[in-house]
């Protein structure tokens, strides 16, 4: 996902209740404003109901992207509780759940790979749990036992006054294992498309990530930069410094792959973040150009249109 000219785009939220005219209008608006890239979250809950797949709502979006020449980052988002799980789960709940996730990926990738506008698959929305220990499900226990068998005994915290970071190291490994599992399935189904992730809360979740391992199965690396969520250690005057810092961290850890700002706060937030913030046009432009000056191939705003439901409803829109 390398570009000769930095790209600017936005997340398009596709939701039940939108008409084909609504969706066409979103992509026409992108085209008319020089935005040639967009991101779509592929809600499994919108496509799989009553044991049947119905892709028609998202087909409208992909056809509109084809029509207006907009390239798409498609974020895999298996079925979850949409009302209470805004960002998506980080790990499967069980072996059976992993099989359901695989079935979702197989169905979605196999169907949407037909569209010319599809550019890259975002393997998981905002991986990283910020140090939260892995819940030992049947799947996690199986992976943990295999991993622990190869874990150097001298690094285990069994001695006197020796810090034990076994669980933290397993979190990093398990995150890599799960992302690689998704990447292998996606590559097998659609080898011509890119594979991408967008780490978030970078200053707090950085130990969760093993970027050298990711470089073996990703084609680009991104980040989520939201002033209302991720900039707690900065004053508002220092927000551009935060954008620069986090961009530098991701660019360095992309290890030669292209890096993007996959999500940048583009609109007002009063209730669905840690810090209410209503950026002006001048602020937004400063954050945009700071990211591009840091070497980003492109910036995708969160988001073009406001969501109609859940915690983010009525907020974030450009």
Please annotate each region the language model reported.
Residues 6-12, 36-40, 72-76, 119-123, ...:
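Hydrophobic faces of well-ordered beta-strands that scaffold small-molecule active sites
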Residues 2-3, 26-34, 59-69, 108-116, ...:
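Acidic (Asp/Glu)-rich catalytic clusters
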Residues 23-109, 173-194, 287:
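Aromatic-lined substrate-binding rim segments of carbohydrate-active enzymes
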Residues 16-32, 100-109, 201-214, 279-290:
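Short, acidic/polar
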Residues 6-18, 41-56, 85-102, 111, ...:
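The substrate-binding groove and active-site-proximal loops of carbohydrate-active enzymes
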Residues 196-198, 204-318:
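Hydrophobic targeting/anchoring helices
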């Amino acid at each position: 996902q390398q570009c000769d000219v930095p790209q600017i785009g936005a997340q398009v939220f596709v939701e039940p209740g939108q008409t084909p005219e609504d969706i066409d209008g979103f992509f026409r608006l992108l085209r008319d404003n020089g935005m040639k890239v967009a991101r779509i979250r592929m809600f499994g809950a919108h496509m799989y109901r009553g044991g049947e797949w119905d892709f028609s709502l998202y087909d409208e979006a992909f056809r509109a992207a084809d029509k207006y020449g907009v390239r798409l980052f498609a974020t895999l988002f298996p079925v979850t509780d949409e009302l209470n799980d805004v960002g998506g789960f980080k790990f499967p709940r069980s072996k059976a759940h992993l099989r359901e996730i695989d079935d979702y990926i197989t169905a979605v990738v196999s169907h949407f790979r037909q569209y010319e506008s599809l550019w890259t698959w975002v393997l998981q929305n905002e991986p990283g749990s910020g140090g939260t220990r892995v819940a030992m499900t049947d799947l996690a226990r199986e992976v943990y036992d295999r991993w622990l068998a190869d874990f150097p005994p001298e690094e285990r915290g069994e001695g006197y006054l020796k810090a034990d970071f076994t669980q933290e190291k397993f979190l990093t490994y398990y995150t890599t294992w799960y992302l690689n599992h998704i990447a292998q399935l996606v590559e097998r189904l659609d080898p011509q498309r890119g594979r991408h992730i967008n780490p978030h809360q970078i200053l707090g979740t950085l130990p969760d990530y093993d970027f050298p391992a990711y470089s073996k199965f990703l084609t680009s690396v991104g980040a989520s930069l939201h002033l209302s969520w991720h900039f707690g250690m900065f004053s508002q005057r220092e927000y551009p410094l935060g954008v620069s810092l986090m961009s530098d961290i991701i660019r360095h850890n992309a290890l030669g792959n292209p890096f993007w700002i996959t999500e940048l706060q583009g609109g007002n937030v009063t209730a669905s973040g840690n810090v209410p913030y209503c950026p002006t046009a001048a602020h937004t432009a400063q954050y945009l150009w700071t990211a591009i000056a840091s070497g980003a191939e492109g910036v995708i705003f969160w988001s073009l249109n406001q969501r109609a439901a859940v915690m983010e409803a009525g907020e974030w829109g450009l």
